[in-house]
């Protein structure tokens, strides 16, 4: 739990950390900036507690803290905004957990409660999660616990295994064969059910690759969470730089 001191500091800078761009446009518009975009639906994901986390699933899946913000427990569609190009490949710009059909009117940065709030923040600065293996995920903490139990059993059988080479690699390739749209041969997304549980883990390629990425909670006019967004690429800014 965050300290009272941390919470007081957070309240003082909270409004500075909101996203000024309309993230929902990734899922309603056909063009952002000068780039055509498309939406990929990767299926429903179960959030049994509504406490959620985001991380690189190949590096920090067992250790990541959940966000202070929560969503109502339930099962929701997960969608990916894709920027398809010949030159740069099919890049995943934004991932959305669609909690309701309502339109967001503000976007609050997801926080876990241990961020360093003493540093000066610029207008475009944000806190987020690190990616070191080119993939991201967003899931419920119950899914995290289920994975820990499953992986502990696997490690008992073979202590030298790792999550990519001995689990996700083959599953990603199989999913790419079954659903090739906007995927390479090695696979770029997977909606994986944790064995013997009702939990599932959506994983997806992280934009341009490794980096540091924010998660935003979208709130509707009633102040209720209507969606959660993982932002990998600022399309308008990023593709201008590539030109």
Each language-model region and where it sits:
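N-terminal domain-onset segments
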Residues: 1-208, 212-243
């Amino acid at each position: 739990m965050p300290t009272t001191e941390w919470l007081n500091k957070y309240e003082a800078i909270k409004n500075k950390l909101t996203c000024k761009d309309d993230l929902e446009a990734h899922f309603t518009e056909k063009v952002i900036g000068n780039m055509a975009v498309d939406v990929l639906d990767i299926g429903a994901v179960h959030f049994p507690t509504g406490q959620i986390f985001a991380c690189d699933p190949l590096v920090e899946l067992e250790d990541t803290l959940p966000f202070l913000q929560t969503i109502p427990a339930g099962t929701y569609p997960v969608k990916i905004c894709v920027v398809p190009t010949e030159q740069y490949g099919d890049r995943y710009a934004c991932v959305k957990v669609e909690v309701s059909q309502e339109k967001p009117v503000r976007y609050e940065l997801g926080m876990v409660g241990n961020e360093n709030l003493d540093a000066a923040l610029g207008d475009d600065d944000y806190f987020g999660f690190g990616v070191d293996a080119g993939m991201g995920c967003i899931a419920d903490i119950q899914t995290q616990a289920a994975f820990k139990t499953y992986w502990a059993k696997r490690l008992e059988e073979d202590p030298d295994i790792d999550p990519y080479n001995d689990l996700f690699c083959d599953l990603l390739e199989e999913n790419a064969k079954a659903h090739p749209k906007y995927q390479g041969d090695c696979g770029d997304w997977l909606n994986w059910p944790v064995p013997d549980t009702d939990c599932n883990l959506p994983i997806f390629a992280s934009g341009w690759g490794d980096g540091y990425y924010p998660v935003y909670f979208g709130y509707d006019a009633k102040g209720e969470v209507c969606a959660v967004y993982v932002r990998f690429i600022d399309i308008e800014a990023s593709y201008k730089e590539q030109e």
